[in-house]
Design a protein with these regions (language model features):
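Extreme N-terminal starter segment of soluble prokaryotic enzymes
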Residues: 1-4
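Short hydrophobic segments within beta-strands
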Residues: 6-8, 87
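FMN-binding flavodoxin-like domain, especially the glycine-rich phosphate-binding loop
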Residues: 13-16, 20-37, 44-139
Length: 139
């Protein structure tokens, strides 16, 4: 099963989550592509059966605007039939950006299998939840 983990990370926190998710997907037998959004192509999303997208909270509880937002907007129509999980880290407020992102997915006909947030750098518990997210994607 082809899986892509595509993420943007400014501090390394969301990247740590992406690495953990990708590692577990690979362990479970997925043919995995792990790529930062700056290097990602539309085909990375199009060719995957399973997709995990990661972006931390930015600004006023929003997705990163220079790379991640344009990429996400460009793939919305082609990921409607994918198994999708979304994830990211935050350092202030309460993680509202994830609820906004889930709602945006729903409004665009995109089903989210799981959504995961981690406060600051993911600790052991957050990394375990990353592995659980990968397991949910593989089911």
């Amino acid at each position: 099963m082809k899986a892509s983990v595509i993420y943007w990370s400014g501090t390394g926190n969301t990247e740590a989550m992406a690495n953990e998710i990708a590692s577990k997907l690979k362990e479970l037998g997925a043919d995995i592509k792990l790529v930062s959004v700056e290097e990602a192509s539309i085909d990375d999303a199009k060719e995957a059966e399973l997709l995990a997208l990661g972006c931390p909270a930015m600004g006023a509880e929003e997705l990163e605007e220079d790379y991640f937002r344009p990429y996400f907007d460009s793939i919305k129509d082609i990921i409607k039939d994918k198994k999708l999980a979304i994830f990211g880290s935050y350092e202030w407020n309460n993680g509202e950006w994830m609820e906004l992102w889930k709602n945006e997915c729903a409004e665009n006909g995109i089903e989210v299998v799981d959504a995961l947030i981690a406060y600051d750098h993911p600790d052991a518990e957050a990394l375990e939840k990353c592995r659980e997210l990968a397991e949910k994607l593989m089911k």
